Design a protein with these regions (language model features):
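Conserved RNase H-like, two-metal-ion catalytic cores of nucleic-acid enzymes
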Residues: 3-4, 8, 14-53, 69-70, ...
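Conserved "right-hand" nucleotidyltransferase catalytic core of DNA-directed polymerases
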Residues: 233-353, 361, 365-366, 370, ...
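Conserved catalytic core of nucleic-acid polymerases
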Residues: 472, 570, 584-585, 589-592, ...
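Extended two-metal-dependent nuclease catalytic cores across DNA- and RNA-processing enzymes
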Residues: 23, 73-252
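Function-dense linear segments that define catalytic or interfacial modules
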Residues: 337, 397-423, 428-430, 435, ...
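Active-site palm subdomain of RNA-directed nucleic acid polymerases
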Residues: 447-459, 463, 783, 787-808, ...
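Active-site-proximal helix-loop-helix substrate-binding element of RNase H-like nuclease domains
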Residues: 99, 151-179, 299-302, 337-449, ...
Length: 857
């Protein structure tokens, strides 16, 4: 038989520190459980054990504490974020059928040692742990699997006798002798004072054991200082040997058959995993069933509609319904359901396609769907407009939990409808569609409770149609121009590379941080921060600190900028140009926690515009023949939102008087009339204005604007003194977030902040920065979405040929026939400025040009 024994505390600890904090929507921490389960499942996959035992320490003192008062005396208690996960993990393991083993007076290591020592010679034991104490237990049929979580993924290193000899030069049992000499700071095992790891290993390799060392202490060839240390701490060495020796005879059950996994309690295990929102773990476990409902207990599984063959009569009956749920599988099939039946329409059949398109346009039928954007896209492709979509399950789930990893339909059914019984079906999509009604109902109830149903129906769903249209139209690009620009960049990159090699005096891989660090800080002797295990840091912050004094560093920074511009933006754009010469980016509504729209293939939000060369990229985005581009962006929208949310009179008055807010801020911070403010002062005030929005501190501000930390601190204090409303807002929003567990925008979009309850100071500080910033950034994102909807609808209402084609941050771009361009610019500005009524007027400037570069003005 194969026995797998897990050191529960050790692996849970490794998982906790190896994965960033994760929480459920209601704020329960789950990262340690998630990591532990991934490690356990990976171990089972690798080992294929016949039996599994999971051991844990107990809080009660052990025989080692009685032997030595100082044993583990320096151990801090578990962080509360980890401690709360321990009982939940044990409950989950028990539900899954694993045997948990504990024994008062003994540690998990002793239980592991006892189980491994009592297996028969023909059996095998695999010990999974996060520390090296168990290496002493290795023998021919006992191996140690050192488990860890790196970059969120489980890893294991296998230790047998050969590996221990290779790494340490000793046998497994001699690992105890090494610990006796060097001690163990984590367990507060004293060892011999002044003897470290290297010396301890060397002594045991040479002399085999502490017994042999002390029996021949006066004769062996060692330094006199080492001999003195060994003599002085002989008692401590032997005490440490006892403390470090794992007990092989703890009073626990050693019958392997008793550790064979029991059948899981499917409902209990699934219920726990659903409540922990661990849907991927649930999928990996392949449990045959789903959880029984937990709230309310009396709830019964809903009776699902059943699949029925499509007939013309049934379709007509469906079309007569006031509310229909449907799942758009592809351009080939669409699944419908109401309370009693599920239908599938074949969109390759012209009659059924025509009925479906008529159904989409029918304003009387309320439609609840899984994903509205693909439905809007299909409608637009066929020259119609989808009407009265009142629920988009994906977008609704996103609003309820914007930090979820995905919004997969099966996962959402498990999360929101745990009482739904999903039987195996030859038509899984029929089952999925049958669940839509219940799922939509649950999500709508939650959204209504959070006052977010209007956000879904008036912003997110209408926006999905706008984005579908933008993706369909795309933006024309100058392919030849991009190719020439890329070639020019290649020439400049090659020239910089040659110059860097010349200054370095050798050729090396500039893109390798390790090689670059050696060249800069060892060969050229540039001042370096402390070297780490992975080498010298050569990130942008480090290099920018050296750039003013060293030409090679300036060249390296420019090299990186041009290489990024070429690979990501030039070559990247060339890969995604369609047959029509246009780029059809995918716009995403569920990728960011603030509500901002993101884009992929390509990511148009990240086109670099701070450097002139980056701005040149805009020249390659064109209007089609006979068309022009209209570009409009908001003026300082986040500061205007801040003024409104903070109800800061000074800032509101400045904006409504059309004053230059940065000059006004500089006037207050530097205590002088606005007319005496210099460009440098205004620039620094601008950094303060926007820095405050993003929760910047004195240290970061000082680096951004090149002043001392004390000066930066004074700028921030003077700013908050003048804008007292902003200061008050910054304090109140954090306090409210701590009470509520979330912050929200003016339109009720939420971001949950479990970090505010963390015992980790850095995480708490991060949570506080987000609490201050998200209502501002999120409200600005909501406003630009509203503006997009208004522009799109007005262009349609006025029967214009102009089309909204791009959104980049606070900027909208419309492509319009030359004859419509002026009117389109007027429409865009008006709709952007009227998107939201606040105490501060929104301001938008529109410009027209043949290229994005020209239209940007």
């Amino acid at each position: 038989m194969k026995l797998l024994v897990l050191d529960g505390n050790s692996i849970l600890n490794r998982a906790f520190y190896g994965i960033k904090l994760l929480t459920t929507k209601d704020g329960r921490y789950t990262n340690a459980i998630y990591g532990f389960m991934n490690i356990l499942l990976k171990l089972e996959e690798d080992v294929s054990p016949d039996a599994v035992a999971v051991t844990f320490d107990l809080k009660a003192p052990t025989f080692r504490h009685k032997m030595y008062d100082g044993y583990k005396a320096n151990r801090k208690g578990m962080p509360p974020e980890l401690a709360e996960q321990m009982p939940v993990l044990k409950e989950l393991l028990a539900a899954l059928g694993y045997q948990i083993v504990t024994k008062e007076g003994y540690e998990a290591d002793d239980i592991i040692g006892t189980l491994s020592a009592h297996i028969a010679p023909e059996d095998e034991c695999y010990i999974a742990t996060g520390d090296r104490d168990s290496l002493q237990l290795v023998r021919p049929n006992v191996r140690v699997l050192l488990a860890a979580t790196k970059m969120g993924r489980p890893e294991t290193n296998v230790y047998d006798e050969a590996r221990i000899l290779e790494d340490y030069g000793v046998t497994p049992k001699q690992m105890i002798d090494i610990k006796a000499l060097m001690g163990d700071s984590s367990d507060n095992i004293p060892g011999v004072a002044g003897i470290g790891k290297k010396t301890a290993e060397d002594l045991i390799v040479r002399f085999q054991s502490i017994d042999n060392i002390y029996d021949h202490l006066d004769e062996i060839d060692i330094k006199s200082g080492v001999r003195q240390k060994l003599t002085a701490d002989k008692d401590m060495a032997y005490l440490s040997y006892k403390l470090g020796t794992i007990d092989l005879d703890a009073p626990v059950d050693t019958n392997l058959a008793d550790y064979v996994k029991k059948a899981p309690d499917v409902q209990e295990a699934t219920s726990l995993l659903v409540s922990l929102e661990m849907f991927k773990i649930l999928e990996k476990l392949h449990l045959n069933g789903v959880a029984a409902p937990t709230q309310p207990k009396q709830e019964k599984a809903e009776k699902l509609p059943v699949y029925t063959e499509l007939t013309k009569e049934l379709f007509e009956k469906l079309s007569a319904s006031t509310c229909v749920n449907f799942l758009f599988e592809s351009k080939e099939h669409v699944w419908f359901s109401d309370e009693t039946f599920v239908l599938c329409a074949d969109l390759q059949n012209e009659d059924e396609k025509a009925r479906f398109l008529a159904f989409l346009q029918d304003e009387k039928i309320e439609k609840k769907v899984f994903s509205s954007k693909e439905i809007f896209a299909y409608a637009l492709e066929n020259g119609v407009s989808a009407q009265n979509i009142t629920c988009d399950i994906t977008l609704g789930a996103y609003l309820l939990n914007p930090s979820a990893k995905d919004y997969n339909l099966n996962r959402l059914i498990q999360e929101y409808c745990p009482s739904t019984v999903s039987a195996e079906s030859e038509l899984p999509l029929a089952s999925d569609c049958a669940n839509l009604r219940t799922l939509a109902k649950k999500i709508e109830v939650k959204l209504e409770g959070f006052e977010q149903l209007e956000l879904l129906r008036t912003i997110e769903i209408p926006l999905a149609e706008v984005l579908a249209s933008m993706e369909r139209v795309g933006v024309l690009v100058d392919k030849e121009g991009i190719q020439q620009f890329s070639e020019m960049l290649t020439g400049r990159i090659d020239a910089l590379q040659a110059q860097i090699y010349d200054l370095a005096g050798e050729e090396f891989n500039i893109n390798s941080p390790k090689q670059l660090g050696v060249v800069l800080f060892e060969q050229l002797k540039l001042p370096a921060k402390k070297k780490t295990k992975t080498g010298y840091s050569t990130n942008a912050e480090v290099l920018e600190g050296l750039a003013s004094e060293y030409e090679i560093v300036r060249d390296i920074l420019e090299y990186r900028t041009l290489a990024k511009l070429k690979s990501t933006y030039c070559d990247g754009l060339l890969k995604v140009i369609g047959k029509d010469g246009r780029i059809h980016s995918s716009f995403n509504q569920t990728e960011t926690r603030t509500g901002r729209i993101s884009s992929t293939e390509p990511n148009l939000q990240n086109i670099p515009v701070r450097q002139e060369l980056g701005r040149e990229m805009r020249k390659f985005f064109l209007a089609g023949e006979g068309n022009l581009l209209v570009d409009a962006d908001y003026s300082q929208i986040e500061l205007r939102v801040l003024a409104d949310i903070a109800d800061d009179k000074a800032m509101i008055d400045a904006f409504n008087a059309d004053a230059d807010i940065h000059t006004i801020t500089a006037s207050q911070v530097f205590h002088m009339p606005p007319e005496m403010v210099t460009p440098l002062m205004r620039s620094r005030a601008k950094a303060v204005n926007f820095g405050i929005v993003y929760g910047i501190g004195a240290f970061s501000l000082s680096k951004d604007i090149g002043v001392t930390r004390a000066e930066a601190d004074k700028y921030i204090k003077d700013y908050l003194h003048h804008y007292a409303g902003v200061n008050s807002y910054m304090e109140k929003v954090v306090e409210q977030a701590k009470k509520d567990g979330y912050v929200k925008t003016l339109f009720a979009r939420r971001r949950y902040l479990p970090e505010l309850a963390s015992s980790n100071g850095m995480l708490r500080a991060f949570g506080e920065r987000v609490a201050r910033n998200m209502p501002i950034q999120g409200t600005a994102a909501d406003i630009i979405k509203i503006a997009m909807i208004r522009v799109y609808n007005r262009l349609k209402a006025e029967n214009m040929q102009a089309k909204l084609i791009l959104q980049v941050h606070d900027e909208l771009i419309v492509e319009a026939p030359e004859a419509e361009a002026e009117h389109a610019a007027k429409i865009v500005s008006e709709e952007m400025e009227n998107a939201c009524k606040m105490k501060v007027r929104l301001k938008s400037d529109a410009n027209i040009g043949k290229t994005w570069y020209d239209a940007k003005g």
